[in-house]
């Protein structure tokens, strides 16, 4: 037996849960091998993970057949089982890095953001890698403020905290720095021309563009000087004096050779070479001028240079050592000289300097590295490197600590204040930071930074969610709820609701971040080969593929240790791939199909919207055993029949027919029978006979889309017909809103006997005669039927001799013989009004009269005298015939004569009343027979009457011309008055419109007067008068004048259309007309959609309302007023009869009422007669209002009780338990919505025709509880009005005892209250629509409920739609279902929390019982959409709108759906808990007396057995709580 589902719970899945669902990890993005068409291993369709493609067959084919079931093939690893497992076996993708679930990120408000107290923007910045979030600040300080946990940091801020504060100053090419690399700088110091440091710190070069190497040169050289002039020293520094010569001195060569002169910046070397070998090297200091040139050959003793005055060392050369040899008066100095020779190297962007500033290099050391070894710079000799022209200077905030001895830290270490750096503890750090050891300058730099833990992406968010202590957070937020600021409290409440949802449901916040992504079973995302060898695939496969590709790439990059920026980008792309899979297009641009702009359908798209799983597949499935065809009229059918084409019936009833054929021996077995049916030509007559037998006693359902109310589907007994069309009974057309201009209908077969019984009893067309919306007949004569019946019951009034008086009947008859008086002319005989016909033809009984008609003696329309049941009736044979027709149909002549009025012609309304009265007095079956009779005779007489219309039937009255001339004269006067300045332009416009409206009205009256007096049998007139077709406005346009037209803007043209259609319109008139007509058409199209949407919203808000019990026992009631204030005078007047009927009919009296001497007891169902009695009593001033039970005050949870609901209007009897009255209410309100909309185009956009612009939008505004645009100012208190007027504004004061309330209004406000008026709270002070929310605050829920019902009714009444108040009340009750907590008392509720009134009341009862403080609340008014979304059933809400939001909220709270309403049960494929599916009906058994006796005896025995102790041992006892 199938287990019955009791509840459905939705929750978050933990990563472990997701992995436990999975049958294996999908590692590759491959799907199917296009050659073998087999799934790829580890791919999205892998058979090892998801199961075999063919039943009981592994992938390699080693194991086939069912006997190997459950075995896993050792070759291919596929389990041998049914292929259906591919519909529910899931896989998973293990993510390389966690990813957030977009529903919990982008929902409004974001669930993750709410928990972590991050805004949506902040959360997005972290998840998509544009900002860091702090997990552990570790004492970090940013701009003098301590960094906090969960603070967001930009890349710069993070780098500053993690790697120190630094600023980069770019330098233009060719500009050299003014500070050295590694030099300490202060704020404001110039780093380069025009570049100033904004920071204290250390300047570091970035990408120097030029390197200067100062090579150290050494040379041993000699110099002979006069001894007396020599300034003796052991070494000479650059620029020091060597000698002071008193007179010029010539320095001579001491060897012969070739001169080689090497000049320095100052001074020079002179080398003498012999055969290329140097023989002597001389030093020429500053002050000594060479006398020889390079390459000159010199002799020994030849002067080489001349010296004068001071001789000194060049500025860049020093003598490290001096050896002196004195020879007589001269001294020969051997000098060991050292100097630097700079060499510059350009550094290109692709090259890299590998030594620091000031570094000493040896010959062969690399200074600049490059990709091409040829471009590298290698040291030519020993030297010192200097860096120049950096691309930029980086100033790092760092402390510099010089040291002497050994360093105790190394580069990259992190230190805190007080940590030892060098020199055995003498040098210590006094800041947090990262160490850089500079051995060139013997310093330790500590770059000020922190070991802060801040991260990006879902990983960081997951860590924070894991660390959340929900209990502590709850306590903290409860404290915050005591804060005086309302905004702070509201924010805390929202967070607290989420926290509690997690706490109560047992979900963990970190589960909102995915570590593994589940992979949908492959048969739910199929891939099929289409013609041409290409593959058609579900969009999900593309989305999964993207995800797997990115995931695998990220894994690879992580394994390779790729740079942070690449990893970060890949992680972001992975997050975006997960987002696209879950909800494509929710963030950023949607992922589209390659080659088109169509966004891919993600999992969210598959669920939500009209084409989503909920609405397309769960709430509305296509069904088998159905067909559709065009409908044609079937006038010969009975009300409960429909004509079904034979071929269609054959297909629909095929299984039944096959069985019957086998039974009757037409075919040996079912297979043969099926083959016989497939060969269409071979179908024998026996088959058709068998089909007749099969359908005998069965019913089928006919449906016409759009199904706006329950009468859009009705059951009929099929009658087999030739042809291809379904034949429909004319009288059900109104319920279906069907006509025969090409409409199609669908046929469905209820299969089970239960379904057949239900269709036959509940849905048969003959059982659905009254409208559930108003209780009026829906199956009633219309069109031709009315015309025929009106034709025979109309009487002739002739003019000839009318008004003549005769003394005796004989005189009158003689005058008639002479042709002076017509048969039907009204005359007086002996002072009594009569006619010749009544005198001449006196019949003893109705049969005689009808016989006379048959013999052509009198016409059906002549007035004659008939004796009947002891009475003399003056009536026409036609009316007698009509009475006879009714009598035969209802099989009760007495009742028939009571039902019909013989003194009026039978038109639309009288026929409707006849049907209704017949229903009340005679019941359903006889009424159905009556309808068939009326249909038959109506068609017969409308045919034989020969009534049809031609152009000449549109008769134009003589008076029209005169009325138009009169109007033109008045028009001239208005224009003159305007010209002379007596009227403003607006007044002139209004007066012209008024004039033409009056003129049109006069012409209309003239048209009808003309018809009545001169052409009473004019077909046009007959049709309009009888209600068969056309209305006075259309007749006016045909015969009178079209009148005023509307502009596209909705205003009215002041020039009317003077012509009628009979006369034809001028070009200008035609043009003017076209606007309105087109607007009507456009309106219709647009508003049909709005109306359908409204119906959908109404159904969604009311579907759970079912009649659940007989009496809820409430003492509350509503008072239906019988009077209402006049719009203009504000004095009370009796409400319209129809309005009172809509409020009272079928209700239960809540208090006893005695009127006009009749006592109506409490608990009585008010019939229409009772209502009429109450109206009479109101007219007599005996009663002002009637106390009745109402759904608004019903105490039944999730529904209403019989008493509060009253009559089932479609049956005119108390409603049955289990009736889905909520849906009936929604349909009753929604169905006319489309009529309202479509009403426009009938009048072709004539001005004055009620255009629904006030209609539907107003209804929607009321049901959505929107604040109206032009809203009235309402008084918030009871009091007396005082008005003060100033230059720019009006002040209206409402004053009550010791209290006054002021309302400031603009000068042009149209006041409703006068100075000194007494007003009540909630009463409008100015014109406009009342804001229901304000009314609720001022006057309470009852006032709002009455206001909404009344305002909605106003719109429907304006359109002539009858609708019972209780339908609107049911919807309004659902709008008023919720309350807001103002003080939680001793409960766990929160201030501002919204929940159902029932729940609060139940909670309060419990609190009071426990002696605790109850919850204080205020009523809320919610629009139907919001109310529907707030329902407890998450299945119902999710299938309505905002699917993702509803499911997100429900999942977090771990909501359980109790399956109370209808939608949730339909979604799960259960019987709906209404009608025959309600427990009341399902568990009610119908038994005969014998069974009843047996049950009674069994019950007695059970009681006795219970009283006897269980003596025998081993008696199996039922476990408590288990159902036996």
UniProtKB/Swiss-Prot annotation:
Keywords: DNA-directed RNA polymerase, Magnesium, Metal-binding, Nucleotidyltransferase, Transcription, Transferase, Zinc
Listed GO MF terms: DNA binding; DNA-directed RNA polymerase activity; magnesium ion binding; zinc ion binding
EC number: 2.7.7.6
Main enzyme class: transferase
Swiss-Prot/TrEMBL cofactor(s): Mg(2+); Zn(2+)
Binding residue positions for Zn(2+) 2: 1112, 1194, 1201, 1204
Tagged with keyword Transcription: yes
Catalytic activity: RNA(n) + a ribonucleoside 5'-triphosphate = RNA(n+1) + diphosphate
Cofactor binding description: Binds 1 Mg(2+) ion per subunit.
This protein's GO CC annotations: DNA-directed RNA polymerase complex
Binding site for Mg(2+): 739, 741, 743
List of residues binding Zn(2+) 1: 58, 60, 73, 76
Transmembrane segments: none
GO biological process: DNA-templated transcription
Region (Disordered): 1501-1524
Assembly: The RNAP catalytic core consists of 2 alpha, 1 beta, 1 beta' and 1 omega subunit. When a sigma factor is associated with the core the holoenzyme is formed, which can initiate transcription.
Family note: Belongs to the RNA polymerase beta' chain family.
Function, in words: DNA-dependent RNA polymerase catalyzes the transcription of DNA into RNA using the four ribonucleoside triphosphates as substrates.
Protein's UniProt name: DNA-directed RNA polymerase subunit beta'
